[in-house]
Amino acid sequence: MSVDVTNETQWVIDPKVFSDLGIWVLDQMRVSTQSDLTIMFVDPDPIAELHMRWMNLEGPTDVMSFPMDELRPGDGKTVMEGVLGDIVICPWVAAQQAAAAGHSTMQEMLLLTIHGILHLLGYDHVTPEQERQMFGLQRQLLLTFFALRHDANVQATLPAGTPDALALYDAAHGAGRDLDSK
């Protein structure tokens, strides 16, 4: 199984934690070890462009998933293999959401990684029942991963003096983004 992690931001992020999380979640969901996944961390401008292009929604968002081979969780007897797809995460939006939720940016980005993987596997949260199922599963997966990997909750940080890219985006494009309108 291959989980490639790319960080195109100034955030200091340990790619191994996210690679390990991806491999572990795919194993828990019975996806073949021959499957591939890419996780990218980007600034507000690139994710805002993707958000507009693919969702026709303005502004940066926290996470977007781009499925490739439409793999689904395995039944325990057979496992699906192929290219699962790409997950794109904006640490700036994650940091804002984490502050609002009262937990660390790293916890938020790990949660968003699981959220993105579940979307790639066909989960959604359009209806209340789907939301209950998906959010319950992502919480269970995250808490279990933390229980197994105590070192997974290291902090994601920014080098001193790094300008706030989300504030710069808002200044250039107008503030007033609604984080709850995903």
UniProtKB/Swiss-Prot annotation:
Keyword terms of this UniProt record: Cytoplasm, Endonuclease, Hydrolase, Metal-binding, Nuclease, Ribosome biogenesis, rRNA processing, Zinc
Molecular-function annotations in GO: metalloendopeptidase activity; RNA endonuclease activity; zinc ion binding
Annotated Pfam families: YbeY
Any one biological process term the GO annotation gives: rRNA processing
Required co-factors: Zn(2+)
Binding residues annotated for Zn(2+), in chain numbering: H115, H119, H125
InterPro entries: MetalPrtase_cat_dom_sf_prd, YbeY, YbeY_CS
Cofactor: binding details: Binds 1 zinc ion.
SUPFAM superfamilies on file: Metalloproteases ('zincins'), catalytic domain (SSF55486)
Compartmental location: Cytoplasm
Enzyme Commission number(s): 3.1.-.-
Keyword Disulfide bond in annotation: no
Main location: cytoplasm
A Gene Ontology cellular-component term: cytoplasm
Role description: Single strand-specific metallo-endoribonuclease involved in late-stage 70S ribosome quality control and in maturation of the 3' terminus of the 16S rRNA.
Family membership noted in the UniProt record: Belongs to the endoribonuclease YbeY family.
Protein name (Swiss-Prot/TrEMBL): Endoribonuclease YbeY
Species per Swiss-Prot/TrEMBL record: Bifidobacterium longum (strain NCC 2705)
Lineage of source species: Bacteria, Bacillati, Actinomycetota, Actinomycetes, Bifidobacteriales
